[in-house]
Amino acid sequence: MFNMNINSPVRFVKETNRAKSPTRQSPYAAGYDLYSAYDYTIPPGERQLIKTDISMSMPKFCYGRIAPRSGLSLKGIDIGGGVIDEDYRGNIGVILINNGKCTFNVNTGDRIAQLIYQRIYYPELEEVQSLDSTDRGDQGFGSTGLR
């Protein structure tokens, strides 16, 4: 079922001349950096959809996960949303959330997030009356402790 050629290139389109090709900063970087195609200002506590002006076709049985860049996370900038479905072909946008105390400026050409390709499984769902029991059961948030 997961017959995919990992050597096949991922095709992308620069929708405008403002777009910058996704890049990896090292040979073993997990993600490809995505770049802002425009200037934006994000006040503290606000969010903004940042356009990359890039569209691409995801590899079969993969989706694109938009992940934060660690350097931006240190400045209080996080990512909202973050899934590019296998069949999406539009302009890739990144929702940046400013959790910091200062206004955050995004300039054209800034690296704003990283795109990580991940395999996906499309299971059939089956509604049942109950689930198999486990030792953990319904114990959720924090139930396994910190250590």
UniProtKB/Swiss-Prot annotation:
What induces it, per record?
Expressed in the early phase of the viral replicative cycle.
Cofactors required: Mg(2+)
- Where is dUTP annotated to bind? 68-70, 82-85, 88, 93, 95, 111
Q: Which UniProt keywords apply?
A: Early protein, Hydrolase, Magnesium, Metal-binding, Nucleotide metabolism
Q: Which reaction does it catalyse?
A: dUTP + H2O = dUMP + diphosphate + H(+)
Q: Which InterPro entries match?
A: dUTPase, dUTPase-like, dUTPase-like_sf, dUTPase_trimeric
Report if keyword Cell membrane is assigned. no
> Where along this sequence does the record place binding of Mg(2+)?
24
Q: What is its EC number?
A: 3.6.1.23
Q: Which Gene Ontology BP terms does the record give? A: dUMP biosynthetic process; dUTP catabolic process
Identify its protein family: Belongs to the dUTPase family.
Q: What is this protein called?
A: Deoxyuridine 5'-triphosphate nucleotidohydrolase
Per the UniProt record, the source organism is Rabbitpox virus (strain Utrecht)
Gene it is expressed from: OPG046
